[in-house]
Amino acid sequence: MSSTPEQAKNKGLTFRKFKDGDNKVHWNEWIFDADHSHKCPEYMLSSPPCQASCPAGEDIRGYLNIVRGIEKPPVGMTWQEYAFRRISEANPFPSVMGRVCPAPCESGCNRNQVEDHVGINSVEHFVGDWAIQNNMKYTSTAQPTGKKVAIIGGGPAGLAAAYQLALKGHACTIFDEHELLGGMMRYGIPGFRTPREVLDGEIQRILDLGVQTRMKTRVGSDVSFDELEKNYDAIFMSMGAQSGRPLPVSGAEAPNCVTAMAFLRAFNDGRLKHVGKKVVVIGGGDTSIDVATVARRLGNITNINPDKARPEHVIAGQVAHDVADISARQGAEVVLVSRATMDKMNANKHEIEHALQEGIEIIGGVTPVAVVLGPDGRATALRVAEFEVVKGETVLKPGTERELPADLVVSAIGQAVDFTGLEPFDNNKGLIKPDSNYRFPGKPHIFVGGDVIRPHLLTTAIGHASIAADGIDAFLRGHTELDKRPKVDAHRFDMLRKLVESGHPLEEYNHKQSWGTSSAKYAVHNFEDRSSKYVIPANELFLGHFPYVDRNVREMTSLNAEQALGNFEERLQLLSEKQVVDEAKRCMSCGLCFECDNCVVYCPQTAVFRVKKSDVTTGRYVDTDYTKCIGCHICADVCPTGYIQMGMGE
């Protein structure tokens, strides 16, 4: 008999393989190999990785199960509305986020271990658009508390906080320096990615809850922070980071060297109608792609007075372009420069691909060295070079410097918070550092959220607002100490709420001593909710249950360089209702029963059985007769979702 190299290393083995007294298998492994054990199945609710990966904390598994028809809506409600209600418990902007969120939930999706992630973003997009088309409204059943909350900033964090607090019965007033609400959703993202009618519709739903606004009002100058503290019971600070960071190189003070935030604001305000012949953008994230694609669409106008209509004058707010001039628009050469190589850029991959299709040149792996100035002090080129990082320092590679001609240079290398009038809150790094409940240390009535904590995703700002709103609500109700947030801080399936909703509320506990019971109606038997602290990995699922199914992918209108010029139409196309339902069916419902019947079919003792149809609800589809169960763990082995765990008896 031949031996493997690994076996040859085991010198303790003889031809008998085991010494006298050795056990072939350790006793604590018997449960996994024997045909019976002391353990019996229990039904354990875990969080799926998509929810744990969602900064907004959406109950993603929940609304996918609604769309696919597993979790039934209340009588008289469509599945579309029920899915919308479930999404908006965490996120009041499903239509916007379904379009622009980079979907970290999809990166975490366990379905990636089968073939491809579930198109979570596309389902949210469909549900959000359906809600707008069908005029869905938010309603609050909470009694007014008489408490007032001031919200500084009307961007995603401020609006989401106002929404959550209004649902809890508190009166909210948003203070914003702009003419319109929306923050980065309006002024930082172009309209061909977030159509303004969609954004306006989702904002109006929040205002319809009774939220008040003070527009064109800057806290710190138009109204003092002291006034807010005097007139309001709590304050939520969500000013955003809408000031761009200039290039840290010589020549960056040139008037035609501008920040991405200023560029996008001028475009979204409707003031900027065209750019120069040659535009160079420095960045690598989604904002830099937005700037580049906007510049490609705006194009260049040659026969125009340059002193009157230079882009930098418009961006600085000195003048606005005349809409009559755009008929003479010609294509602009747009180059995007990134320190990261193209495969490692932070921008969404499909956005990079579309930028290339539209004729935008992307140069990765180079760093800005200097802005080259002409005799008039304006930028004429950006000097770049290849580099390497040595001990944290950028070292230029000799002989790799080159100049990229430019009559407009746009820096998209980061954002900053303007603390004018609010300087005491600056942590000397241009940000605010709150505690884990997003409360400002030493100020129990002040909470913080959004890019003032750390410039990040829109969905992150929405998640901050949800957590902060819980803290504000607790504070306003007299709780000075706030509860510790759960490890998995997301909106989750609530078994008790579902039992009430489906007409099966638990009975009152009679407080009488008795032996263990599986028939009393005052408890949910053999069920454990670990969703606040446990995320179920793919290796705890029965992946063999799931056949290969192609993802339903949204179509994206592809434009070449000529077609992109002057084209401000939305590119992302909605899935059909059938496609959305089919896509939701690809969800593996990680950590929660999706009623496949595997456990019932394969149980050799017929111990696992379906609950009576009149008593069925989500998560209570099957039960176990423990007088028959021998602990063979077959039901757990064949459970596709990992909902059945061999725990009872430990």
Give the location of each predicted region.
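Conserved beta-strand-loop-beta-strand element in the redox core of flavoprotein oxidoreductases
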Residues: 215-235, 373-402, 619
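Beta1-alpha1 glycine-rich phosphate/pyrophosphate-binding loop at the start
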Residues: 25-27, 49-51, 58-75, 84, ...
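Glycine-rich dinucleotide-binding loop and its adjacent helix/turn
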Residues: 123-143, 201-221, 244-328, 427-443
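Generic beta-strand/beta-sheet core signal
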Residues: 152, 175-177, 216, 237-239, ...
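Extended, hydrophobic alpha-helical segments in both membrane/secreted and soluble proteins
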Residues: 156-161, 172, 243, 281, ...
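Ferredoxin-type iron-sulfur electron-transfer modules and their immediate structural context
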Residues: 1-148, 196, 235-253, 374-375, ...
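Flexible loop/turn segments at secondary-structure boundaries
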Residues: 181-182, 222-223, 243-246, 265-267, ...
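FAD-site-proximal beta/loop scaffold in flavoenzymes
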Residues: 255-279, 297-300, 306, 371, ...
